[in-house]
Amino acid sequence: HTAHIGSESTAPDVSSNGNISVISRFNESGDGATATVGSGNSSNVNVSLLGVTESLALAEMEAQAKAAIVNGTIRAKGNVDVQMLGRLIAKAEVYNGSTLGLYNATVMVVRANAKGSMEALLNAKTIEAATVNVKNDYYAQSEAETGFAGGLVAGIGSASSNVAYATTSSTAKAAFGAAAGGNITGSISLENLGHVSAKALGRSATVTVSGLNVAVNVINADLNAVQNTSFTYGGKLDIKGDVNIRSEILREGDFGKADAQTGSTAGASISLVGASANKATAATATQNTLTVRGVGENRMTLTGSFTARAKSVTESFAKAALPQSLGLASIGSMISDSSTRDVVSVTVTGACMEIDGTFKAESIGNTASTSEAHKAGGVGVVGATATTSDAKVGAASDKPQTVGLTVTGGSIQALEDIILRAYNTGKAQSIVKKGTEVSGIGITKTSLPTNSWYSTNVSVTGGAVLTAEGSITLTSEDTTEAKADATGTNIGFAINADFTKGENHITSNNTVTIGAKLQADDSLTVTADSKATMTAKTVADGGGFFTKGTLTAINELIRSCLITVAENSDLSANHGSLSICANAGENDVITTTAKITSGGVVALGKVRTDLTLRTTSKVDVHDVGSIQNRFGAVTIRANASQNGVVTNSSADCSGLGVAPDVHNQATIELESDVNIRNV
């Protein structure tokens, strides 16, 4: 589905005394692809019977939609407008009509895939216009719902899981290009706006059947959208207004979210088949990339300001839960797993600009990862069961939540300010709630850890020259948060203290690298700043029967803030301050609490808090040309702090015949260094 002028192989010249518009609209009605098991009356249904034990509903939407002006010379006395407005939607579900009986139902496998591409492109040789507007406003949604199609059956067989997979893996592009320059008498707006989501649900059966084999639910929601926004020019490009570039993955309603939730089965004395876990997994792994590139001998003159912002706001939510109406059920294990691994980047390469206003580039990542599991177990549970709620920001140490901003080469001159900022913030929260169990039979493990990995950086290298009549500000910030609360009142019965604990782990790396010339007539400020909020809480109170081992709460924070001013750099300010500061821990709030109260049914007296805090803050200045403030001070500082750190252990177990044994363990390593050599 394409609306276009020109192609890769042709280069038409287009002239207009008015406006030039290329607009592509795709699936604005939002119908998409739909598949329903058990409906039997839809032309968009793809239903397969896999053997005799599984039914499959598969909904896929893979489309390419584009609005484009490619190559050639564009001359318009009015405006040039290129817009892509479209929706990629895939929905697959189990029909839950009341006409289906209680027999001959199978395990339901439901998959919804929303993929394909949406593009808004203006790539001309030269362009003359009043204003230019390039906009890609797109939607990509996948929804999968599984469960019982109105009935249950004894002897389902080896297949044992109702499955729902919702995957959104769309790609989106928005581009402005003027290979040989041009003249714009107004402003340029370039926008790439993503409304993306993935939702997978496991429905709860509403019938009550005795003595039957039923399946558990396995639910996955994956949000893997990729978004690229580019502004490219060569030659001489004159702009009489502003340039605004905006690349955003939006968090509005269900958009910006991977949502996976299980229901469960209902009825008395139901036994599981094969698999024994209800599992919900939600993951975001979006990529949002914005590039500004000057090609060859290039020069941009701008009477207004230049603003480039890439921003992603995402959420991953996984919930393994039970319907409140569930009776004395054997439900097996409950597992929820949420993670975010988003990448946001802004790159400015080889751009030569003369700006009458302000140059501002921002890269922003804001994410939340929440995992919630209801307690497993119950009468008649066979074998070991577990409740696990695992929340992650980042997927692993080598796959962190990443936000970066890079300027390489080129020259940027601004009559006002130059602002470069990378901001990385996230929250990981793990929750375990009371389930429906009435005893501790078969419950062996309840855990709710959080793990987070962050990477944040600002880099100005390659001999870039930044000159401002106002101030120059380079800032790399991370704000991290983690919460795990294991309180007996919230969790319920039968809690094994060796496994059940409030537990958080955060690793953060924050860097600023300068290999360039920075000249500010006012102030020059370079900052790397890291702040953490952590709450680990384990409380044995009247709400739960704690047994075995030691009651423990754990917080671990490992982070570094590093500023490097590399060889051949020149930094100068005239009428304001010049500061280079790496700050870590100054605004932390870290609370670690382990507590036993006599009001609980608590068969232990050992209590521990375990805090590990390793913070490195460094400024490394070496082999630079000069660092100079003509009329003010030069401040170079590295600050590694432990403000806001509280640990609390207590045991009140009088009358229970248990001797209290209480310890606080804190390992705190703070390293701050300023290294200046050959300056």
Q: How would you name each of these model-derived features?
A:
Residues H1-V679:
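Low-complexity, glycine- and small/polar-enriched segments
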